[in-house]
């Protein structure tokens, strides 16, 4: 696939990758969700692995190619209040506080802008204000937090101190109903977008939770012979190289969603290993499959420190699979830089594209 994708007046240009596999420091361990900070930096929640390695939140500066920088990390593994077991969603409040959902504890932990623990709220259960395996979280313009209460198939709105404000949704496949919802995003008007994981769609709701639109339909990419992967969600049939061939409008367990200022909608199509792009009316535009042909700065540092890694890398007959997404889980759009940032979970990296607003195609004189 080309490094630049042009469709209906929009161009999406691959920029660079960030990351490497690492249980701490400059890298990721199954990055699961992300959010933008108030200064345009990025917070990444790492799921970690079954050996309790790598659970944490990274605070990073993205910038352009080679400009990435690790600013801090916190919410590491443990049972204390300042720790997380299964960090899932992450959001930044108006005052810079960072909110992290813990799927295992069914709580929300709050940290200040420097990563210092402030407080924790949330009680396991299925009653009003209780949580069961909370997933995505997002901060409204009012300062309230919308939590994707995944295990209870609903959304709940809380004050920054954890007081319940409202809730909507229930289990099901109808309008405004959910089946293991995952990621969440808001548009500039405060409308809510939810990645409805097991219903294979994204739902758009009004700021008060009224159903407005369903985006996407269920479908799988063609599966290659004997293609198989094991993720932290269990065994999963996988076919990374064929992701490019599937129609743009189908979704297979979508996990993350973002909306840009033009209203275009970006969906992490987890099961199909790609990023699907829709217009503001929910019509499919195109999809991206990952184009990391250039090693990330942090990855290159690992190779420079271990020449045997480069020897092994150069023996690979076809590197194309390494360029592509493998179970992408999250996406954010930075309106200040027009960057589309995708959490390429199984590759332990972020892939960065840029939406080009002034793109002019090459004109040949014939």
Question: Predicted regions span which residues?
Answer:
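Eukaryotic scaffold repeat domains enriched in small/polar residues
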Residues: 1-366
